């Protein structure tokens, strides 16, 4: 069977080595004679797995000791509400920076929960010569007392990534769902990081929260116990039964990433993958991209065919060639190739070859 390269934005492809190991261990994990899905989450064997997973993630991301690592339910959207409910008690206010669809969704959820009076927002994307560009504001010039400023460094739908570090007088809350572990960051700059698992961590149903000690002292609102960060810390992310299989796969992904050289190593490969694809797009008048070079996403490359009438044929022929899930998000259309950590360089080589041949045939 020919190789299949899955460019889905999420749930995304997992490393082949991880999938093969999970397949081998499915019916007999760790010599238990049963699947990891079938054992108690409070057994010593599973507790050892969770401890190793946290240790590996801390090592990979160089997470300081004054941060807690939580494995929670709900994905990214679950964290939209959890952040508000955990930090905005007693009429606290927050600022949301809007750079695309997902930061807009986080803003809408926050305003729904506490009202617009407690939530301010700034649109940080402008048009530069017809292309989307991020312009980060000088937050130190804003006279306000916010509990936190929220932003999304990588917008999967819009193909926009913010590489510059955000400088803020207030704690930074970041949605890293689509960029976590794809490149190195300084965790100590953040008050809280959250990420849905289904892009660079594992399957859907799990989210990772990395929260600084002092953030847990902020007044909270009444909320579901399973989304309470303080309870999650107190109970080692096991206030109730966690998504054990997703946790197991996340642990395997962390171990795989360590074995490949860690984040510094995968970041170089990710940069190479993105450069190859953007060079193909820019070097051919058949395709176009709507983002300035400085803000083009390395994880989610969006592009359009100049002749949109060929979109259907492009997707059909790509599927035949083993290049799947290239259709752009329904909101923006066009094409999108997601290049998360698990996507091998060979996948980009195959995609670029196909795109060049398709353009030559239909120009």
Curated annotation (Swiss-Prot):
EC number(s) reported in the record: 2.6.1.52
Pfam family membership, one: Aminotran_5
One GO BP: L-serine biosynthetic process
Cofactor stoichiometry and binding remark: Binds 1 pyridoxal phosphate per subunit.
UniProt: L-glutamate binding residues: 42
Cofactor dependence: pyridoxal 5'-phosphate
SUPFAM superfamilies in the cross-refs: PLP-dependent transferases (SSF53383)
Residues modified to N6-(pyridoxal phosphate)lysine: 199
Reactions performed catalytically: O-phospho-L-serine + 2-oxoglutarate = 3-phosphooxypyruvate + L-glutamate; 4-(phosphooxy)-L-threonine + 2-oxoglutarate = (R)-3-hydroxy-2-oxo-4-phosphooxybutanoate + L-glutamate
A GO term, aspect molecular function: pyridoxal phosphate binding
Keywords noted in UniProt: Amino-acid biosynthesis, Aminotransferase, Cytoplasm, Pyridoxal phosphate, Pyridoxine biosynthesis, Serine biosynthesis, Transferase
Top enzyme category: transferase
GO-annotated cellular components: cytoplasm
Entry's localization field: Cytoplasm
Biological or metabolic pathway of the protein: Amino-acid biosynthesis; L-serine biosynthesis; L-serine from 3-phospho-D-glycerate: step 2/3; Cofactor biosynthesis; pyridoxine 5'-phosphate biosynthesis; pyridoxine 5'-phosphate from D-erythrose 4-phosphate: step 3/5
Coiled coil location: none
PANTHER family: PHOSPHOSERINE AMINOTRANSFERASE
Similarity comment: family membership: Belongs to the class-V pyridoxal-phosphate-dependent aminotransferase family. SerC subfamily.
Function according to Swiss-Prot or TrEMBL: Catalyzes the reversible conversion of 3-phosphohydroxypyruvate to phosphoserine and of 3-hydroxy-2-oxo-4-phosphonooxybutanoate to phosphohydroxythreonine.
NCBIfam families documented for this protein: PRK05355.1, serC_1
Protein name: Phosphoserine aminotransferase
UniProt organism field: Shewanella baltica (strain OS185)
């Amino acid at each position: 069977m020919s190789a299949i390269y899955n460019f889905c934005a999420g749930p995304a492809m997992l490393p082949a080595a991880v999938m093969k190991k999970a397949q081998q261990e499915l019916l007999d994990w760790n010599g238990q004679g049963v699947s990891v899905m079938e054992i108690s989450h409070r057994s010593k064997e599973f507790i050892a797995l969770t401890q190793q997973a946290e240790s590996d993630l801390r090592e990979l991301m160089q997470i300081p000791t004054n941060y807690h690592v939580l494995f929670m339910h709900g994905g990214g959207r679950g964290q939209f509400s959890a952040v508000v409910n955990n930090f905005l008690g007693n009429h606290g206010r927050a600022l949301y920076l809007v750079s695309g669809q997902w930061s807009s969704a986080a803003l809408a959820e926050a305003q729904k929960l506490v009202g617009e009076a407690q939530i301010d927002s700034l649109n940080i994307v402008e048009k530069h010569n017809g292309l989307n560009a991020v312009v980060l504001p000088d937050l130190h010039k804003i006279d306000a007392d916010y509990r936190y400023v929220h932003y999304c460094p990588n917008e999967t739908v819009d193909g926009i990534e913010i590489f510059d570090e955000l400088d803020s007088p207030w704690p930074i809350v970041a949605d890293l769902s689509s960029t976590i572990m794809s490149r190195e960051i300084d965790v100590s700059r953040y008050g809280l990081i959250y990420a849905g698992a289904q892009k660079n961590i594992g399957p859907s149903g799990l989210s990772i929260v990395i929260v600084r000690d002092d953030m847990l002292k902020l007044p909270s609102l009444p909320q579901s116990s399973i989304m309470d960060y303080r309870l999650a810390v107190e109970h080692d992310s096991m206030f109730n039964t966690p998504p054990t299989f997703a946790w197991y796969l996340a642990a395997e992904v962390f171990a795989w990433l360590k074995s490949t050289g860690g984040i510094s190593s995968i970041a170089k490969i990710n940069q190479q993958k993105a450069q190859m694809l953007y060079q193909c797009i820019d070097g051919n008048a058949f395709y176009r991209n709507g983002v300035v070079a400085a803000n083009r996403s390395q994880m989610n490359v969006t592009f359009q065919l100049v002749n949109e009438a060929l979109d259907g044929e492009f997707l059909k022929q790509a599927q035949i060639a083993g290049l799947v899930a290239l259709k752009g998000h329904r909101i923006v259309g066009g094409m999108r190739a997601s290049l998360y950590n698990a996507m091998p360089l060979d996948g980009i080589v195959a995609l670029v070859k196909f795109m060049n041949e398709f353009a030559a045939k239909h120009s």
